[in-house]
């Protein structure tokens, strides 16, 4: 009987051990979308507030400019997009905040809808980027000059092989020249000026 009891408890212990090991080896649950955005924003604030030379915010201006201001997270601005070949000339010299011209190439036109409204934005790559790993999407909208920087905002996208993209305006950010005029910031071209306001992502401090 003792032997049988011992076997019973040994089997139970093994079951518990297997359960614990399975729990330890299983992947963590996915981070909720809103928490992902909040974490990203907190990390950016911490980086900008640091004494790292990578911070675009001068130490004397950090109390005035930080933490960064954002529109409330709105999943209606997190939409799928398809990249289609861009019409017109591929090459473009994009004017910048310091009076220079940045050489760009059109990667294609992103087609998507926000709040039921069909929209398009052209995605660009630096002319020197031959492998086109990252897409640069500068855009202007009706919030510029009042709620957001007058020179527009940016999105960055990892290039996909499918032409399908996850376009998330909650991740839209203002150019570094907002914090420091020494930065050279491209202005969105006419084709990327939206008539509707995009009240999502980074904004000016109220």
Model-derived segments and their meaning:
Residues 26-28:
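Bacterial signal peptide processing site
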Residues 183-206:
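Acidic/polar low-complexity flexible segments
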Residues 172-188:
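Low-complexity, intrinsically disordered Gly/Pro/Thr-rich segments
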Residues 85-151:
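Mid-length scaffold segments of soluble, non-membrane domains
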Residues 137-173:
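Acidic, glycine-rich flexible loop segments
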Residues 2-16:
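Bacterial N-terminal signal peptides that target proteins for export
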Residues 21-24:
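C-terminal motif of bacterial Sec signal peptides marking the signal peptidase cleavage site
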